[in-house]
């Protein structure tokens, strides 16, 4: 911390960490404080898993699924960055998703039960979908026509027009979405593509996008 933060701000951070831990039935077991020019919060989580679902299991013929539509956090960032007034519930939701991301842990747990491979997409579908494809030795074909069928697509597209950023950039390259990407057969989630022979990620009926956040380049 910088030493300039007021006590209530610090307490709000502590309350937020405690609440998120409570949702997962986890315990906060320690920590330390140091002074720096900017506030940095670093958290390490430990746990046990009987049968991990990794990025390595995707097979040709699998389908590709999302736990929920991505792009809302990037939409919220652009609304804030451009200083726009929030004119709809959808815009309020987008800003909330950027400022305080929500994670559907139940969806993640259910996905992992039947998925052949799985990852989060907080750096973007383009980057982490590509990483999953590389780990599994396959190609992910992401289909824009499938994504358009999501019931929230039209609302997100309206925001994209207002902020002047292509909706596909928000969905595929935006990042900061706390959603899950998985491969498998007949998963009860939103299908966005298929697994085919090849490598990397291919966008079908989706214009070129900037890939998103790369920790080793940005």
Please identify what each model-predicted range represents:
Residues 163, 172-176, 185, 196-197:
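A structural signal for short secondary-structure junctions
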Residues 46, 181-185:
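Short hydrophobic/aromatic beta-strand micro-patches
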Residues 62-63, 177-180:
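Short, surface-exposed beta-edge/turn micro-motifs
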Residues 101, 147-151, 188-218:
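Acidic, Ser/Thr/Pro-rich beta/coil linker or hinge segments at domain junctions
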Residues 44-54, 90-110, 163:
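Active-site glycine-rich loop that binds ribose-phosphate moieties when present
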Residues 2-5, 79, 98-174:
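Active-site-proximal betaalpha loop/short-helix elements
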Residues 52-53, 186-189:
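Short, conserved charged micro-motifs
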Residues 1-81, 194:
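Glycine-rich anion-binding loops of enzyme active sites
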